[in-house]
């Protein structure tokens, strides 16, 4: 989170509207974010973003208590024509964590005064492992205790297969100071 506060103390907006919280509750062994439940911004493909606005000051008086640390607004692309394709691949210097992702974004007109902008991303990444055995766990193992995992604490990134994201942003001017707009997304990944 911003300003050293828990992740659910930063308000996340998409196109100026509140983003719902994730179903994941964070736990990091006594960290500042224990019990926090913030939005999952990893479901937004980077290619879908027009820009990101960050308000680093507390904004609780304007937005409520979930903006104590600040506000981050993800603005989605709203082009009604054109597009792009992006391919990313790489790995860590340790020889693990290889990843490959393909993203695409394209805009289409919606009537004479509107747009539909669609972004997809598919890919996968292999796990990374930077674990070392904790000394207290190593002592327990040396003393004959069974059931102590090796390593006791894993550090790294899990294997991610079939990581698929789809974001659709749309809007249209209906005249007479009336506008219809919205966005929809779906995502799935096997971890």
Task: Pin down the residues of each PLM region.
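Short, glycine-/polar-rich solvent-exposed loops and beta-turns at beta-strand/coil boundaries
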Residues: 5-6, 26, 63-68, 98, ...
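Short beta-strands and strand-coil junctions in structured, solvent-facing domains, enriched
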Residues: 8-9, 19-21, 58-62, 92-94, ...
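Extracytoplasmic loops and strand-loop junctions of Gram-negative outer membrane beta-barrel proteins
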Residues: 33-36, 54-55, 86-89, 146-154
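Transmembrane beta-barrel wall of Gram-negative outer-membrane proteins
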Residues: 81-84, 94-191
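Outer-membrane beta-barrel channels and translocator barrels
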Residues: 7, 46-49, 77, 111-113, ...
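Extracytoplasmic beta-strand/coil segments of soluble accessory domains associated
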Residues: 1-24
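N-terminal periplasmic accessory domains that precede
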Residues: 1, 13, 39-42, 66-87, ...
